[in-house]
């Protein structure tokens, strides 16, 4: 007599879910139940019987048929689930959900009859781009500000300044104030979490602390105490404090100022290991311009990726977002551990919940963007060849050979492959999209006008493989 086969019927559901209706043969149910009883029998201890020699009926009486059925049912469902996935060649994204619930299935379970269950799981969504070529984006183009070079020099001077005590004047912007303070909410008189300090060195610069805090210390003298009535910004990092009014009692305990070094060749040698101030300025200018160009390029790429994502048609399952959120939290925990913090005590259930909520919007955006790039690779048949991966792997040979830790080569290869593919996709987007760069020039404000007149200039950049070829021909 032929062995009864598992019957599997699948039905697509919204949000990239799929339903599996399984009819499991009674033969499978009986086999799994007997295996469960045998397994428990080998380890169970019942007075009067040797381990592994307990009769089946005694075991059923002692443990109970319901408990044995429950253990067997878990095995039956898991085994049948794995077999169903192979039959249908489906890779699930999430653990299967038993639609009727385990208790309900258990109550109706009989090993003498075929078992019918319905399971649901998330699967990878079907991806489609409404459009891939000819995307059009508009970005704001800014010019490099030469003043940033002097600002960087002043920041460097500040870092190498001598700190000297101040005794004969009031506090002013640029000083270092040693303060103690205690804050409470105005409406509830409750102390602000993290709003108290016995002694803190505070550089009196605008935008430090909440609005009005630094300004309130300016003009205070050592020994002065002052009450500051302030308000937390609506976008403050701690949600509980947003928009709330607060009262801070501040005491100025000590005051210091920075004695800035002269801008000369000696300073260049001290701060940047350069032979002259002229050489230091050139080096700073190069770094700032490189960073500026990178930022401009990043802005363009972000705009192109957003435009591509807007063209994506896909029903994204919740589990994909959940996985991304979990990965983000794990990465945060790893950074905490690298900083020497105790992850177990730091990552309380409340913090994990807060992180999950705050990072979810960005996680959703990341998933959408990654799927859009995947869809682009499939639509335009963009791939990474093995020789490209091998060539890139050579850059890591020294690091791999010198590392004291075991390197997962397979995982490294996967990361390199993904990075190379993303680079190719972004280059393709740049070559096949239209970027409009808007530059705004502002005229001087006159006495008779309250508003500033602005002229808007639009520059369109469209780089395609065809245009590149044409340019080469024209040059020839």
From Swiss-Prot:
Keywords per UniProt: Cell cycle, Cell division, Chaperone, Cytoplasm, Isomerase, Rotamase
PROSITE patterns (UniProt xref): FKBP_PPIASE (PS50059)
Matching Gene3D superfamilies: 3.10.50.40, Trigger factor ribosome-binding domain, Trigger factor, C-terminal domain
Region: Disordered, residue numbers: 436-476
EC id: 5.2.1.8
UniProt GO BP: 'de novo' cotranslational protein folding; cell division; chaperone-mediated protein folding; protein transport; protein unfolding
Main subcellular localisation: cytoplasm
Compositional bias (Low complexity): 440-469
Record localization: Cytoplasm
Signal sequence interval, chain numbering: none
GO cellular component, one term: cytoplasm
Residue span(s) of domain PPIase FKBP-type: 174-261
Keyword Chaperone: yes
Catalysed reaction equations from the record: [protein]-peptidylproline (omega=180) = [protein]-peptidylproline (omega=0)
Domain of life: Bacteria
Molecular function per GO: peptidyl-prolyl cis-trans isomerase activity; protein folding chaperone; ribosome binding
Domain remark in the UniProt entry: Consists of 3 domains; the N-terminus binds the ribosome, the middle domain has PPIase activity, while the C-terminus has intrinsic chaperone activity on its own.
Family from the record: Belongs to the FKBP-type PPIase family. Tig subfamily.
Function: Involved in protein export. Acts as a chaperone by maintaining the newly synthesized protein in an open conformation. Functions as a peptidyl-prolyl cis-trans isomerase.
NCBIfam families the record matches: tig
Protein name: Trigger factor
Organism in which the protein naturally occurs: Prochlorococcus marinus (strain MIT 9215)
